[in-house]
Design a protein with these regions (language model features):
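Hydrophobic alpha-helical transmembrane segments of multi-pass integral membrane proteins
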Residues: 1-353
Length: 353
């Protein structure tokens, strides 16, 4: 008797893309309700703003990374990743990690273990094929799992560190994933979509930009108020912008499935420059963090999940009206957030509060 796999659990990205999309809406609605004094989360040990940041990172972004990782590693190695019942169990494990901590702090262990489990699964497959170059993905997922644990331990008062540090570090790690994977796929997708395009792609330069990016993040974590940090961050932003220009973003104007990736990546150089300005005290750090969080991460996620969902199910990779609307809305949201925060006052309360 042939066992049929439920389509939802046939490929790694399907349940996790869906869960991430659902949770992003639910968590944002809860955050808006908390801002207006009518949240349903109740009074707990974790302040609302930190819960919001945590769920955007570990409830939304890393969930997409997990789904992408399971699907990408299957494609890279030719080996099967969890599907059917095992994938269903992973999905339920994720759900327990989201809902359990709302009832008891003991359930946070489920949330903490999710990313290391995904890292172990994909790491084993990558090692089986000796694809050492791709080990960065399970390694980063493992570090994200550790940072998630540090966040909970600091938020509940078990260790004496600022609980914002693991949150910001986690966001920076996610941006590093975007830089590494984006640097591979965005120029490639662009070249495939536009026949005869001439790009500037230099591996040595890309490696230098990657090194500057990692250095900027480390400096900002340990020395956020420093002239050196500010200058390195701004320089990194300029280098990232040069890298992006080499991929010929303006040539993608008629290809929404590609231009969304360029538009989203643009927020990365902008984020570094804003991070440098925050070290000088010229802008709030939250502007830089949301440039990375909404503009870059949100934009790259909506761009990549629509693309990978089409590609891995054998459909034509072309953005329709619904997809384009989603692309535009995410980018407009990022711009509105920036305007709201810069103008504070009326605009901030009207758009966010």
């Amino acid at each position: 008797m042939i066992k049929k796999t439920i389509p939802l659990f046939a490929l790694g990205f399907r349940p996790f893309y869906l869960l991430a999309a659902f949770w992003s809406v639910a968590a944002i609605l809860e955050w808006l309700m908390e801002l207006s004094g009518s949240g349903i989360r109740g009074i707990g040990s974790i302040p609302g703003i930190q819960w919001h940041a945590h769920e955007m990172i570990f409830g939304f972004a890393t969930t997409v990374v997990a789904g992408f990782s399971l699907t990408a590693v299957r494609s890279w190695t030719g080996l099967e990743t969890p599907k059917g019942r095992s994938l269903m169990l992973l999905a339920f494990f994720w759900i327990a990690g989201r809902l359990g901590p709302l009832f008891s702090s003991y359930f946070v262990i489920i949330d903490i273990l999710f990313l290391p489990i995904i890292a172990m699964i994909i790491g084993k497959l990558i090692l089986q094929r000796s694809m050492v170059r791709n080990l960065f993905l399970p390694l980063i997922l493992s570090v994200l799992g550790i940072l998630n644990g540090l966040f909970y331990m600091s938020a509940y008062g078990h260790i004496g560190i600022d609980s914002n540090v693991p949150l910001i570090s986690s966001l920076f790690l996610i941006v590093m994933i975007e830089i590494m994977i984006g640097g591979r796929v965005i120029p490639s997708f662009t070249a495939n979509a536009i026949v005869g395009i001439k790009q500037f792609r230099n591996k040595s330069f890309a490696t230098v930009v990657l090194a500057f990016s990692a250095t900027s993040f480390l400096l900002w974590i340990f020395f956020p108020v420093s002239v050196v940090t500010a200058l390195i961050c701004i320089l990194t932003g300029v280098l990232q912008f040069i890298l992006l220009l080499g991929w010929k973003p303006l040539a993608t104007r008629s290809k929404p499935i590609v231009w969304i990736l360029h538009a989203a990546y643009f927020w990365i150089p902008l984020g570094f420059i804003l991070l440098g300005f925050s070290s000088f005290g010229l802008v709030s750090m939250y502007i830089a963090l949301h440039a990375f969080g909404i503009g870059a991460t949100g934009g790259l996620i909506i761009g990549m999940i629509t693309r990978t969902a089409m590609g891995h199910t054998g459909r034509l990779i072309k953005a329709g009206a619904i997809e384009v609307s989603c692309y535009v809305l995410v980018q407009v949201t990022a711009v509105i957030w920036m305007v709201a925060h810069l103008t504070v006052g009326v605009w901030f309360h009207f758009t966010i509060g």
